[in-house]
Amino acid sequence: MKKAVCIMSGGMDSTLCAVMAKRAGYDVVALHFDYNQRTMKREKRAFDEICERLGVVKKINLDVSFIAQIGGNALTDTSMQIRKDGVSNDVPNTYVPFRNGVFISIAAALAEKEGAQAIYIGVVEEDSSGYPDCKESFIKSINEAINLGTSADFSCEIITPLVNLSKADIVSKSLELNSPIELTWSCYESEDEACGLCDSCRLRLNGFKKANAVDKIPYKK
């Protein structure tokens, strides 16, 4: 059976990717990262619950807390305020420098070890916070680098099925494919109730609104 490493944060985008990988006939190896982000425990809980729901047998949780040591972002540095003034065209302070590059590189090492043919990652370029490492051009370039820098008998494809979708499209697709969107967590700041104001919450809520769907996770009143 063909195999895919799925980078899973516990959010709705990466969860949908895992569902799509399974539907495409891949045996999913679920990969989650702890980097001392504010909602680390809540994201890990979501990851575990989602894997159980999807019947994922092999799941790996890696400590990459060196990302927090590098710093420079509001997700790992609690002295910085997470911006809550709405989504803008500027790169927000929640951007973790080259995070996806780090994650994909580690996923590639795991894929080579596992003999996986694909890496799934839920990057979204069209309707997102404008993170530079979510661009389709970046993904294509790092995919080329991976295949140049790994064994001659290994080759894998980075699959980004959501990259050109809107958040509304992602919500609709999740509901269509019975992705467990109600188990996912998107908030950058809170672990008990989503704040509803950070970029990630705003994008999520707007996606549900445009899809005429109800988000079942708890939000602060």
Swiss-Prot record:
Binds 1 zinc ion per subunit. Its cofactor is Zn(2+). Keywords: ATP-binding, Ligase, Metal-binding, Nucleotide-binding, Queuosine biosynthesis, Zinc. SUPFAM superfamilies: Adenine nucleotide alpha hydrolases-like. It comes from the Bacteria. ATP binds at M8, S9, G10, G11, M12, D13, S14, T15, L16, C17, A18. InterPro entries: QueC, Rossmann-like_a/b/a_fold. Pathway: Purine metabolism; 7-cyano-7-deazaguanine biosynthesis. GO terms for molecular function: ATP binding; ligase activity, forming carbon-nitrogen bonds; zinc ion binding. GO terms for biological process: queuosine biosynthetic process. The keyword Zinc applies. Its EC number is 6.3.4.20. The keyword ATP-binding applies. Zn(2+) binds at C187, C195, C198, C201. NCBIfam families: 7-cyano-7-deazaguanine synthase QueC. Catalyzes the ATP-dependent conversion of 7-carboxy-7-deazaguanine (CDG) to 7-cyano-7-deazaguanine (preQ(0)). This is 7-cyano-7-deazaguanine synthase.
